[in-house]
């Protein structure tokens, strides 16, 4: 069930909100039970058989947590639980990749049936691994099965995050004031509308200039440099508006029930370094990789060479977390390399005592280099095949696709738009859309800043002119965002991070 579907918007969500409000009148506990039940139904609506997997995962990890109350047994049970979670994740997500790799190296064809990847398995598995690791570190064991179930399964974040921490979620479920603020609900609805607009109006339309081109290259075709750059930049913006739009929608939905989720995006394309980019992009994943992988590996405490090795290993595994394939490994490896170079640069500046703030020219150059590096890495993230990624890179830099004619395909073609305006004019239309989307990403405040959410409750003065207030004007803007999104929902494109 997609957030951007009529079934969700006009059936599931109203029914859940009304049932929650009615249950809350009885007791806070009843409201939490309703949310837990609704969340399980939400997941089961996709494929009921995998609801059993989710329930089994929750029951297993909750029971392991209870068993870890005994300090003597805690390390062994915790290690077993982490290994078991990883084994389940590896079976569903990496079996095909492992067997394909073995077959390629050995030359022996291995026949196996495709395994359907359960939605959100990377997210709910990592959250529960973090829970077990925290108990091993001395955190309190959760004894309430309903609160634990909702921590894992709360439908706004269940499928594609944000990755949440038990310590920031479970206490909220137990507070009696949860869900009682009308202003909080109004802010949540407006944030949801903004996220839906980013997904349906921006991301899905940008996809029409990216997906057909990448598919064409994956199939062995070629494209001229102009179309290669248009598709790559369109995807760069598509994945940002798609995933940040989902995160905004999740935050907004949670606020309808008085629950606060963590911020997941902080205008990442405004970053002037790769280090800063990862403090702004998929913030909750960066937090997980730092706290449960990079720091346990030694972080930067064991010398510079070990720090760079830890960075590379962390980002390689971060790439594999996104998907089972060499393209994701290369994407993660590139970002590990970028981060290492960035830290080397900082170390060199420090050794030269160049500690003054960079000037405008240096910041502009740093921003351009950072964005260029991120864009190139996205090629591997998006391409379905290594050959397709290679052809895209060749086309971007003029080594491939010279003299190649490309006829646009996809939804735009089915709408006869290329026939009406011609391929060259269509290229200009796509360029205009990309330019507009970049302007939004680079020069406007992000949704959390506009709505004063979380750490942006005291937004800088320069954003005061667009700051959200519970008034008629913002009610109108919310209605316009919702209505324009509803008209665009006929495409029914899934969120990109559903595949992870």
Model-derived features: positions:
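Membrane-embedded transmembrane alpha-helical bundles that form the catalytic cores
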Residues: 1-499
């Amino acid at each position: 069930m997609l957030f951007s579907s009529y079934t969700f918007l006009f059936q599931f969500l109203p029914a859940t909100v009304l049932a929650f409000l009615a249950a809350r009148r009885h007791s806070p506990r009843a409201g939490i039970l309703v949310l837990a039940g609704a969340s399980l139904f939400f997941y089961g609506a996709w494929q009921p058989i995998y609801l059993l997997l989710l329930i089994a995962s929750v029951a297993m990890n909750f029971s392991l947590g209870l068993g870890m109350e005994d300090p003597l047994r805690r390390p062994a049970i915790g290690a077993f639980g982490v290994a078991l979670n990883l084994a389940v994740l590896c079976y569903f997500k990496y079996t095909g990749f492992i067997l394909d790799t073995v077959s390629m190296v050995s030359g022996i064809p291995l026949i196996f049936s495709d395994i359907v990847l359960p939605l959100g398995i990377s997210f709910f598995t990592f959250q529960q691994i973090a829970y077990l690791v925290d108990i091993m570190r001395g955190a309190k064991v959760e004894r309430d099965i309903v609160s634990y179930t909702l921590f894992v399964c709360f439908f706004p974040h269940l499928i594609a995050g944000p990755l949440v921490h038990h310590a920031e979620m479970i206490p909220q479920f137990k507070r009696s004031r949860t869900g009682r603020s009308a202003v909080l609900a109004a802010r949540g609805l407006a944030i949801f509308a903004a996220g839906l607009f980013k997904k349906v109006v921006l991301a899905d339309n940008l996809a029409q200039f990216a997906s057909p081109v990448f598919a064409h290259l994956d199939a062995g075709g070629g494209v001229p440099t102009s179309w290669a750059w248009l598709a790559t930049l369109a995807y760069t913006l598509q994945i940002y508006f798609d995933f940040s739009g989902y995160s905004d929608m999740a935050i907004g939905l949670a606020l309808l029930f008085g629950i606060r989720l963590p911020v997941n995006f902080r205008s990442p394309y405004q970053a002037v370094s790769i280090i800063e980019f990862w403090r702004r992009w998929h913030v909750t994943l960066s937090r997980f990789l730092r706290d449960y992988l990079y720091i346990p590996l030694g972080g930067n405490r064991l010398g510079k060479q070990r720090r760079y090795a830890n960075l590379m290993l962390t980002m390689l595994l971060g790439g594999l977390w996104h998907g089972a394939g060499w393209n994701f490994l290369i994407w993660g490896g590139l970002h590990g390399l970028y981060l290492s170079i960035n830290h080397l640069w900082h170390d060199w500046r420090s050794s030269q005592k160049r500690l003054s703030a960079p000037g405008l020219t240096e910041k502009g150059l740093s921003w351009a280099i950072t964005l260029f590096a991120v864009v190139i890495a996205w090629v591997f993230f998006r391409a379905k095949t290594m050959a397709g990624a290679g052809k895209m890179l060749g086309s971007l830099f003029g080594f491939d696709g010279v003299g190649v004619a490309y006829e646009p395909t996809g939804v735009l073609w089915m709408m006869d738009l290329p026939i009406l305006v011609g391929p060259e004019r269509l290229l200009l239309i796509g360029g205009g859309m990309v330019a507009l989307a970049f302007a939004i990403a680079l020069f406007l405040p992000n949704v959390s800043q506009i709505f004063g959410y979380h750490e942006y409750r005291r937004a800088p003065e320069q954003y005061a002119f667009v700051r959200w207030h519970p008034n008629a004007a913002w009610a109108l803007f919310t209605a316009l965002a919702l209505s324009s999104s509803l008209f665009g929902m006929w495409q029914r494109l899934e969120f990109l991070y559903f595949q992870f």
